[in-house]
Each structure stands twice: as structure tokens, then as C-alpha cells.
């Protein structure tokens, strides 16, 4: 293998997570990946620290926007098309957290400790804003529009789609119609979709 070989992680990478900056564990894992004989690529999932991830400078790489975490550990941003090995790869990370039915707590809420204690006692699924949940888990309108614009450049035809979550059309089949067909899946001609 060489650095021109790619391992692609379909979201929930976990290598950029600690709220206080890069921890010793993260440094160790990221340096280990960077030292491998391949390049690690990832799209974001819904369990990412978006404050830290989005703080990396945006760079162009193989035709699309990325965050370079290390020289060979690269976040493929949403709505981008990358040309690798003469293949067109459309990336669109993110997803809606399903483990937040009890809500999102605000750490600066005066009743935070009480609310957390009640939820913990009842084993209720919740998240804490900017600690283990970020609104950026879902794509912004700007990211959606950029994805559509980039797809139009390629006449809505790509070889691969890399995402974190399955298409809403797949969810619709599995959920007995609970989800509606999404705009992108209805327009794109694709050979393979990885999620």
C-alpha cells in the first residue's frame, strides 16, 4: 500500500472529539493513522465535535474542500466531489441523532445540574450542547446548495457516494413510509453508495 491508497470512514470518526483540544489519546491515534502506509479519509457523522472539526483551515484537495487533520488524515467536507483514481466521489456527511429524545441540555442553564440528574436517574437519552451534541450534525442550507451546484457540474452523475446515513428513500422502505424521499437521491445517477 501507499499514500495513494485510501481507507474511507463513513462518519463518527472520533479522532477530533475532546472539547478542550487535542488530547494525548487523540494525538497518539492521529499520529498512528498518519504513519500508516495509506491515507485515511472520513466524512463526518452526527457524533463529531464540530466546533473543533470546523476550526481546521479549509483546503482544496482532489477537486473538493477538506479539513486536513494530518497530512494523510483528511475530513472530506459535505457536498463535495473528489476525483480519485479516475472516479468521481460525492461526499455528504452528517445525520440526525436518534439518541436525544429527552432533549438537548444547555450547560449554562441555571437548572442544568438538576435537569441532568433527573434525566440520568430515569436513564433518559439526552445530549449536552457543545459537549456531545452540535446542531451542525445536520447539513446547513448552504451545504445542501453547494452539493447541488457541484453535482450539476458533473451532470448529476458520480461513481460513488460516501455518506454517514442511508438515503431517506432506504429509510422510507424500512420505516413503512415514515421518511420522505430526499431531493439528492432522486436526482443523482450513481454506481455505488457507501454509508
Q: What residue ranges belong to the model's regions?
A:
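Proline-aspartate-enriched helix->loop->beta-strand connector
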Residues: 158-163, 181-195
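Core catalytic region of metal-dependent phosphoesterases/phosphodiesterases
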Residues: 1-84, 180-181, 187
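Active-site-proximal loop/helix segment associated with metal-binding centers of metalloenzymes
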Residues: 85-176
Amino acid at each position: 500500500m501507499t499514500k495513494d491508497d485510501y481507507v474511507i470512514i463513513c462518519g463518527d470518526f472520533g479522532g477530533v472529539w475532546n472539547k478542550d483540544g487535542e488530547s494525548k489519546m487523540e494525538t497518539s491515534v492521529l499520529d498512528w493513522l498518519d504513519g500508516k502506509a495509506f491515507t485515511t479519509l472520513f466524512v463526518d457523522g452526527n457524533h463529531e465535535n464540530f466546533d473543533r472539526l470546523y476550526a481546521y483551515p479549509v483546503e482544496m484537495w482532489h477537486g473538493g474542500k477538506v479539513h486536513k487533520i494530518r497530512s494523510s488524515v483528511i475530513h472530506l467536507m459535505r457536498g463535495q466531489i473528489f476525483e480519485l483514481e479516475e472516479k468521481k466521489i460525492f461526499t455528504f456527511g452528517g445525520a440526525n441523532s436518534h439518541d436525544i429524545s429527552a432533549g438537548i441540555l444547555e450547560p449554562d442553564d441555571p437548572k442544568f445540574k438538576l435537569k441532568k440528574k433527573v434525566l440520568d436517574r430515569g436513564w433518559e437519552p439526552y445530549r449536552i450542547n457543545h459537549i456531545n451534541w452540535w446542531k451542525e450534525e445536520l447539513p446547513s442550507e448552504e451545504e445542501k446548495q453547494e452539493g447541488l451546484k457541484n453535482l450539476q457540474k458533473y451532470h448529476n452523475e458520480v461513481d460513488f457516494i460516501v455518506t454517514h446515513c442511508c438515503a431517506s428513500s432506504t429509510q422510507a422502505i424500512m420505516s413503512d413510509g415514515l421518511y420522505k424521499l430526499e431531493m439528492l437521491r432522486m436526482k443523482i445517477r450513481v454506481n455505488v453508495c457507501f454509508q
